[in-house]
Amino acid sequence: MLSSTDFTFASWELVVRVDHPNEEQQKDVTLRVSGDLHVGGVMLKLVEQINISQDWSDFALWWEQKHCWLLKTHWTLDKYGVQADAKLLFTPQHKMLRLRLPNLKMVRLRVSFSAVVFKAVSDICKILNIRRSEELSLLKPSGDYFKKKKKKDKNNKEPIIEDILNLESSPTASGSSVSPGLYSKTMTPIYDPINGTPASSTMTWFSDSPLTEQNCSILAFSQPPQSPEALADMYQPRSLVDKAKLNAGWLDSSRSLMEQGIQEDEQLLLRFKYYSFFDLNPKYDAVRINQLYEQARWAILLEEIDCTEEEMLIFAALQYHISKLSLSAETQDFAGESEVDEIEAALSNLEVTLEGGKADSLLEDITDIPKLADNLKLFRPKKLLPKAFKQYWFIFKDTSIAYFKNKELEQGEPLEKLNLRGCEVVPDVNVAGRKFGIKLLIPVADGMNEMYLRCDHENQYAQWMAACMLASKGKTMADSSYQPEVLNILSFLRMKNRNSASQVASSLENMDMNPECFVSPRCAKRHKSKQLAARILEAHQNVAQMPLVEAKLRFIQAWQSLPEFGLTYYLVRFKGSKKDDILGVSYNRLIKIDAATGIPVTTWRFTNIKQWNVNWETRQVVIEFDQNVFTAFTCLSADCKIVHEYIGGYIFLSTRSKDQNETLDEDLFHKLTGGQD
């Protein structure tokens, strides 16, 4: 047993700075400790010496030199390696953070700076009533995001006049679980599936929620369109390299905010990171659908994703329609909403979920192998040869497409048979010009084979396009998503149909919004305001009867149909190469893209990946595929951990199923994305 003299010799002084909640400046507290004292004992000594009566349960020790939290309170100082020269800070784990949402609304709320980002985002989404938090993450804005503001404010501070939604009361400073917001007793938020208004019955159960009914409407309804001047002031990427810069700031999901240098009250962006949207349901996802619509809208307006002028006008018409409905008194009048019975809503949702198949057609679906057979025109690009289409007899079965010289030779050997699994499917459509084409980029050993198919009419195009899209994902036309995909394509084509000039002329005088607000600045420059308004109203005739939530879902579906949808770009250099390339990361594949031309060079599917890892010394990502195929690259526009996490994150999301509840296997996520640092 140690005497007091021996203890004094074995002990040492430890200086801890304390974040006093009611004082602006931090104060140092000196403790006498020994190496076998556990962290919980250090905190107990601190609280006793501070001698202020308050709840200290949210406080923890932060080790500045090691940049880590000392959260294992049963560990001793010796086990952590803490010595007398350690700089420790006794500080709250929950701090204020400003988040810019996809609809550009700023919210200020209390967030855990000690939990890993994956968990912090989950808590944030519970406060904001956004299901499937695994699809979102936090992005640190690049300097380009603030480039216009720098001219006005060198410190990059937000304008004082900005209206910030303050949710400071959640979660509590003591670190208790987050408020359930507008969630019902089963933690399921309920909204009107037509206009997205929250069901009033859930509001009475949680009157202390920081997300009041008024605040919920701010998050569930589209914000008024920005002026053309404000649009012009926003950063717009002009090349794939510029787009790659947008994705450099994703935070590491396996580390805490504090560990990544995020300061209290700093501004971060909350964004949908993974373009794999699971189980979107208007009854429960009004906020999620609106924020997803807003992220898609800004991607179109700022040209973060390419689209044709015809498609831009469709998006503009939908925006105009959504803006009108969002501003109308009907949609914002909550008082007249009837209460939604939770059990009825759950049963109704179950009916919708199970509606896909009927019992009498089940046997037919199992035994029948769907097949498409028709005359299509084919063109294969060759250097120095003009673009000439030639007609062949095509058969589409399973995930393969074969073609013959004519129908009579169908029973013989095809001229060529191609498996479309893993191919790129790009629409090549001009409805006004009656052009319905499909561009296929089929991966081969040395790159990509390019071919074009030309259909005669909308129905033929919708059937073959849907079949190609499913085959690229490894699915056949027997899949339940085939017919809905055909209908979605037809719906999008009908939105592009031109309407009579008389209808447009009568509406032109009633357009009470600036048409330049609904298109990208470059598109606006190509048209006079009146001409642009006429074309938007012309397209609007096809969507004028849509309810609000349906219009948002149509916008999201149209966004998903764009060739570049779901691709996140990074500037990389492949092993053995002397030039930089672009790596596109999608929900099911990686694409090597020529940085100069934007043309895909090689595609690798996630289903063919055997393993992937990071060489942390060389900062190189190494991927092994089937058949002993390897590729390796270094990331130039971002940390290699970000790309590593993207691959693992998408593979993690592919494990979700509707049979599961909404509880995620967080350990599996970190196993797939964490790497070994």
Swiss-Prot record:
Membrane topology per the entry is: Peripheral membrane protein
- InterPro entries, alphabetized: Band_41_domain (IPR019749), FERM_2 (IPR035963), FERM_central (IPR019748), Kindlin/fermitin (IPR037843), Kindlin_2_N (IPR040790), PH-like_dom_sf (IPR011993), PH_domain (IPR001849), PH_Kindlin/fermitin (IPR037837)
Tissue specificity field: Expressed in brain, skeletal muscle, kidney, colon, adrenal gland, prostate, and placenta. Weakly or not expressed in heart, thymus, spleen, liver, small intestine, bone marrow, lung and peripheral blood leukocytes. Overexpressed in some colon and lung tumors. In skin, it is localized within the epidermis and particularly in basal keratocytes. Not detected in epidermal melanocytes and dermal fibroblasts.
Q: What induces it?
A: By TGFB1.
* Domain of life assignment: Eukaryota
Keyword Membrane listed: yes
Residues in PH domain copies:
377-473
Check the record and name the SUPFAM superfamilies matching this protein: PH domain-like (SSF50729), Second domain of FERM (SSF47031)
| Entry's localization field | Cytoplasm, Cytoskeleton; Cell junction, Focal adhesion; Cell projection, Ruffle membrane
- Record CDD domains: FERM_B-lobe, FERM_C_fermitin, FERM_F0_KIND1, FERM_F1_KIND1, PH_fermitin
Q: Which GO terms describe its biological process?
A: basement membrane organization; cell adhesion; cell-matrix adhesion; establishment of epithelial cell polarity; integrin-mediated signaling pathway; keratinocyte migration; keratinocyte proliferation; negative regulation of canonical Wnt signaling pathway
Family assignment from sequence similarity? Belongs to the kindlin family.
Record note on quaternary structure = Interacts with the cytoplasmic domain of integrins ITGB1 and ITGB3.
What disorder does this protein's entry note? Answer: Kindler syndrome: An autosomal recessive skin disorder characterized by skin blistering, photosensitivity, progressive poikiloderma, and extensive skin atrophy. Additional clinical features include gingival erosions, ocular, esophageal, gastrointestinal and urogenital involvement, and an increased risk of mucocutaneous malignancy.
- The protein depicted here goes by the name Fermitin family homolog 1
Source species:
Homo sapiens (Human)
